[in-house]
Structure formats: C-alpha cells, structure tokens
C-alpha cells in the first residue's frame, strides 16, 4: 500500500476533497491564476508557461509539470524552448531534477507523436 501512495501526487489525492469542502476558496484560487496570467504583468503566455515548467521541474511536481508542458505547447512553445527551460533547472536545483523533467517532456512528446523522441 505504501508504494501506491508514493507514486501519487498528494495534490491529486486531495484535490477532490478540497474542491468539495472548500469550493469558494478553490474558485477564487482558479480566478487568481487566470488573472495573474492575463493581467499580472508584461510577460506573454509562452514565457509564463516556460517559467511554470521550470518551477514545477525544480519542485518535482510531476503532475503540475505535465500540465505546464501541455499548456506551454498549446501556447506555441517549441519542444526546444521547453527543454531549455528544464535544462536551466540543473545549475540551481540539481541534475536529477532536470533528468526527471526531461523524461516527463520526452514521454509527453512520445505520447503525442507515437514516435520515440531522441
């Protein structure tokens, strides 16, 4: 049973509970996230998502990283730009976190193209 919980992001485990028990807080949090992206400052969407890719790589939030990579791709970021954002993590946060982030990126790209990414 411990192995099962080791492989699940705690955010995923608690999100349903939180949204059911604190719906108005969650809605306000979602609204804040939307406003930060639209009105928070001069950064365009591509740059915002690249920053989020780097942050979630550094924090090892795999579920968030997967979401941020997909949103970066949909905002027009290239595979190379996303990979660069992940590579920038190594000097500050370590090589293992970067390797984990690259694996998640490669997995997403492989899933979307059904081809091996090298």
Predicted feature descriptions by range:
Residues 83-106:
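C-terminal structural segments of small proteins and small subunits
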Residues 27-32, 49, 63-67, 83:
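A generic alpha-helix surface/boundary motif
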Residues 46-56, 85-90:
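Alpha-helical scaffold segments that form or flank carboxylate-/histidine-based iron centers
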Residues 70-77, 93, 105-113:
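Short alpha-helical linear motifs
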Residues 1-47, 100-118:
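Acidic, glycine/proline-rich low-complexity segments that act as flexible tails and inter-domain linkers
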């Amino acid at each position: 049973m411990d192995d099962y919980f080791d492989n699940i992001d705690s955010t995923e485990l608690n999100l349903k509970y939180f949204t059911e028990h604190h719906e108005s807080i969650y809605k306000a949090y979602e609204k804040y996230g939307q406003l930060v992206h639209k009105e928070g400052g001069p950064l365009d969407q591509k740059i915002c998502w690249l920053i989020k890719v780097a942050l979630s790589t550094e924090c090892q939030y795999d579920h968030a990283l997967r979401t941020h990579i997909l949103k970066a791709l949909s905002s027009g970021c290239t595979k190379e730009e996303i990979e660069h954002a992940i590579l920038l993590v190594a000097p500050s946060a370590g090589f293992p976190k970067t390797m984990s982030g690259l694996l998640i990126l490669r997995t997403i790209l492989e899933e979307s193209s059904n081809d091996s990414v090298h």
